[in-house]
Amino acid sequence: MEASPGDEFEHSPQERDGPEIKEEEQLAPTLQVGNTSLKPDGIQCWDDLWDRREGLGKRQPRDPVPRILGEPRWGQGSNDRAAVCGECGKSFRQMSDLVKHQRTHTGEKPYKCGVCGKGFGDSSARIKHQRTHTGEKAYRVRPPAPGPPKMPRSRIPAGERPTICGECGKSFRQSSDLVKHQRTHTGEKPYKCGICGKGFGDSSARIKHQRTHRGDQLPRPVVPRRQPSPAAPAAPHRPKAQDKPYICTDCGKRFVLSCSLLSHQRSHLGPKPFGCDVCGKEFARGSDLVKHLRVHTGEKPYLCPECGKGFADSSARVKHLRTHSGQRPHACPECNRSFSLSSTLLRHRLTHVEPQDFSLAAYPVVPLIPSPPPPPLGTSPSLTPRSPSHSSDGPFGLPGLEPEPGGPQAGEPPPPLAGDKPHKCPECGKGFRRSSDLVKHHRVHTGEKPYLCPECGKGFADSSARVKHLRTHQGERTRPPPPPSTLLRPHNPPGSVPIVPQSRVQGRPSGPSQLHVCGFCGKEFPRSSDLVKHRRTHTGEKPYKCAECGKGFGDSSARIKHQRGHLALKPFGVGDGPPRPLKEESPAGLE
């Protein structure tokens, strides 16, 4: 038997005859909804009307007593919220909710975690926190339905990732990620730049690269073009300074992307939580630490497909591949000459800069005069009065060099150097881009070899040459080398008497059988004069000055070789008289 619509709201006699029913009938005996008249004892689909009015998605359970349309349910009225907060005036239906709410004002946290002691204002928050210690799952996972799993990508555990790389064993959530990753092993770059032809393994990397051609504006889709003729290759367009709007305020380096700037600024701002366990060096990113560890392990995972050579960095392999393909993406805007490396292009562009005239022709040449002897053994240079001829009155601290009115004034820096090779050698005229290269080159003329081998005493003009020489002594050392601290930080101040270990030299060196030991590196010498000359390599003392240019030397023979360069450049008949014969001055008190 089917129930009529009216039977849906039938109630017991107690409910029908109750006082609340009579009160509602007195309040609203009849309701008019459209063309239909509804009464409380005969409401049809009343809950549907109520749900549609409230905008709810599902039907709510019916009240035992039919309500008038528009009357709020019990607990939904403003008069039912008797618990009011005295701080902010917010009302609550239950007193327990008010107590929890007031803890947000007082800061009270009575629920403590038994593991770490952290406090919480609500017991449910403490329960959620304790799951971080126990590893308990908050929700039970239903058994999966038959068929392939349909879990969100971000919630797939690492152990359930179906795609694994056969080269390195790395796992991925999707097969497309595996395909992108395998290109790092194969070197495949299917995404080509339509402007310069550079390839990329990922389309997003190509998009970022294309911004370097037109700043932040992405180029329009490029139709596949024909290959340019090999006779006249077009020079690719390189990014300019105005195409890199993001500038680092610490070092001035420019970037095309803001994310690249933020990544770069980590090296300045810190912190650097990734530390190397081998050498203690710290890095801001974990990827930088991984690259650095290959220096210690010797791992070279990036192999060249042409010759099989390995590289520790992918960028180094990219540069190496250009030697096989002949690709030169870095072009000079002046002469259209292209280079495979950007650093080579920067050095080449210096050749287009006009050098400025900078020489010592504006300064007078001082006649050759002997330099005063250095302080005797056992005295400090700071206590010995300087000779007036060696006062630092002239520019650059050189003796006797007074600028002419047209030259640079006192206290002003010298004119800036410009050009490809601004640092010229006064001996042979050879130019160098860096002053450090000029200093190394000068040792060819002077014969200076300040880098000595602690094993055999052999001298070298370059520190790298000494490092190579030290490898020949590996395995054939007769005595342990001195500790590094003695080589880097001398025990004695410059000019003081070296401390000779008493265990090696008993008493004062009075006979030929005694050895004179260097207090800096422990090297032994049969004569005290050799020890004095050797000490100058540590203290930097250069008592022999050139009268032409004011350059100092630690050995008189080195100064003689240097002065021959000045005489060779000066023809006979020029000057006050014939050139004087060069004699070696032996400082008094040293030998």
Curated annotation (Swiss-Prot):
Compartment(s) where it occurs, according to its Swiss-Prot or TrEMBL record:
Nucleus
Where does this chain mainly localize?
nucleus
The record's family statement is: Belongs to the krueppel C2H2-type zinc-finger protein family.
Name recorded for this polypeptide: Zinc finger protein 48
Provide the Gene Ontology terms for cellular component: nucleus
Q: Where is this cross-link: Glycyl lysine isopeptide (Lys-Gly) (interchain with G-Cter in SUMO2)?
A: 58, 150, 240, 300, 449, 583
Database matches in InterPro entries: Znf_C2H2_sf (IPR036236), Znf_C2H2_type (IPR013087)
Organism for this UniProt entry: Mus musculus (Mouse)
- Biased composition range(s): Basic and acidic residues: 8-24, 55-65, 581-591
Kindly list the ranges of residues that form C2H2-type zinc fingers according to the record.
83-105, 111-133, 163-185, 191-213, 246-268, 274-296, 302-324, 330-352, 423-445, 451-473, 516-538, 544-566
Per the record, where are the segments of Pro residues compositional bias?
Answer: 480-496
Record-linked SMART domains? ZnF_C2H2 (SM00355)
